[in-house]
Amino acid sequence: MATEQTILVGKKPATNYVIATVMAFNAGVKRVVLKARGAAISKAVSTAVMVRDRFLPGKVQIKDIKVLSDKVQGQGGRERTVAAVEIVLEMA
């Protein structure tokens, strides 16, 4: 069984990522990393808070938060800098 799982947060509703996170913890994963870029950052934060406070209260804690910036190719081949975040959730 894997001890860590990464979930990439994107365009789907936040509840999809909440369900994926809860299912990972129920399957025995000890650590889940939520990764998001740009506009999806707020969705990743909402996912982490919903899992911690509503779905698994007292069982999951936010272990670490990393704020990053990624270089991506924009339109016309120009390089852009996009904000990114990694939120680490662990079983308490």
UniProtKB/Swiss-Prot annotation:
UniProt organism field: Pyrobaculum neutrophilum (strain DSM 2338 / JCM 9278 / NBRC 100436 / V24Sta)
Q: According to its UniProt record, how is this protein modified after translation?
A: Acetylated. Acetylation at Lys-11 decreases DNA-binding affinity.
Q: What is this protein called?
A: DNA/RNA-binding protein Alba
Instruction: Please describe what this protein does.
Output: Binds double-stranded DNA tightly but without sequence specificity. Involved in DNA compaction.
Main location group? cytoplasm
For this protein, the record's NCBIfam families field holds: DNA-binding protein Alba, PRK04015.1
Residue numbers bearing the N6-acetyllysine modification: K11
Q: Name one GO molecular function term.
A: double-stranded DNA binding
The family this protein is said to belong to: Belongs to the histone-like Alba family.
Among the Pfam families in the record, one is: Alba
List GO terms (cellular component aspect). chromosome; cytoplasm
